[in-house]
Amino acid sequence: MAAAAFDPLGPLPVYLVSVRLGIYEDEHHRVWIVANVETSHSSHGNRRRTHVTVHLWKLIPQQVIPFNPLNYDFLPTTWKLESRNIYWATDGTHWRLLDHSQLGDTEQLILMLVLG
């Protein structure tokens, strides 16, 4: 008899609400921290674009929230899942879900700001 497939990923958060700068809580009371923010630039004809990608890691219950001296006040206070892969933010921006995966014991979301 074949073993059942095991999917360690939890459901995608529908809401991510900021509880402190760089720390979010979803509707299931799971805590997500900003692990990395990347910015890149690209040119399309005469237009220059900036892309912002945010890596969020879900903390394991009882895990201590690490101190992070970076300032994340440019990130939205709330993200809401609008469709299968788009989060709408309270500041009117849209963020594309690039990845929802498991890295060892760490569940991660990667969101990219959609401009234009």
Swiss-Prot record:
Domain of life: Eukaryota
GO molecular function terms listed in the Swiss-Prot or TrEMBL record: protein serine/threonine kinase activator activity
Disulphide bridges, residue numbers: none
Listed SUPFAM superfamilies: Oncogene products
Membership in a protein family: Belongs to the TCL1 family.
Family matches, as PANTHER family: PROTEIN P13 MTCP-1, T-CELL LEUKEMIA_LYMPHOMA PROTEIN 1B
Name by which UniProt lists this protein: Protein TCL1B1
Organism this protein belongs to: Mus musculus (Mouse)
Gene: Tcl1b1
